From Swiss-Prot:
Annotated transmembrane regions: none
Gene: rnhB
Homology family: Belongs to the RNase HII family.
Cofactor: record remark: Manganese or magnesium. Binds 1 divalent metal ion per monomer in the absence of substrate. May bind a second metal ion after substrate binding.
Membrane listed as a keyword: no
Chain's role: Endonuclease that specifically degrades the RNA of RNA-DNA hybrids.
Protein's name in the database: Ribonuclease HII
Cofactor requirements of the protein: Mn(2+); Mg(2+)
Coiled-coil spans in chain: none
Gene Ontology, cellular component aspect: cytoplasm; ribonuclease H2 complex
Length: 196
């Protein structure tokens, strides 16, 4: 089905990064773009090189009418489950916007409860400029956090795999155990720390 923009002037796009990793927060961003300052080259953050993402991140954060972040920490993910924690992080991102949007477009197939109309857009990060912008802001933010975590725990290789369950990460979990930043409810982490 073809996506049709809603009739609203202040539209926020929302996306998340970090549902799959075993470590760190799930990070969401909300972005309201400025129609008078278009940004060329917005696309799904996963399809862009790191260098291109960084350049677009700077452009988005400078040119957008407003943008914000929302997050759910590992303890919240463990308590709620990853889906509910992601919805909570999205609600936080929208609530943190300094300008309240008239309408919210969310990447994926589910909408969190919001105080304004919202629509989930499947593959929205490739279809909707606002969602693409949000995906880039969230991805760059989370990748930077993983680079910082890598400084604290260099043996895990977080800067490289961003916390995803690669063979290297799983091997290090078994060898070294989990850090306090790992999601204890995720099966590979549970196994590593012996929580059956």
């Amino acid at each position: 089905m073809e996506f049709i923009y809603p009739q609203a002037s202040l539209i926020a796009g929302v996306d998340e990064v970090g549902r799959g990793p075993l470590v760190g927060a799930v990070v969401t961003a909300a972005v309201i773009l400025d129609p008078l300052q278009p940004i060329v080259g917005l696309a799904d953050s996963k399809k862009l090189s790191e260098k291109r993402r960084e350049a677009l991140y700077l452009e988005i954060t400078e040119k957008a009418l407003c943008w914000s972040l929302g997050r759910a920490e590992p303890a919240e993910i463990d308590q709620l489950n990853i889906l509910h924690a992601t919805m909570l992080a999205m609600q936080r991102a929208v609530a943190n916007l300094p300008i309240s949007p008239e309408y919210v477009l969310i990447d994926g197939n589910r909408c969190p409860k919001l105080p304004m109309p919202a629509q989930a857009v499947i593959k929205g990060d490739g279809l909707v400029a606002e969602i693409s912008a949000a995906s880039i802001v969230a991805k760059v933010t989370r990748d930077r956090e993983m680079a910082e975590l890598d400084q604290l725990f260099p043996e895990y290789g977080f800067a490289k795999h961003k916390g995803y369950p690669t063979a290297f990460h799983l091997e290090k979990l078994v060898q070294l155990g989990a850090t306090e930043h790992h999601r204890k409810s995720f099966a590979p982490v549970k196994r590593a720390i012996g929580l059956k």
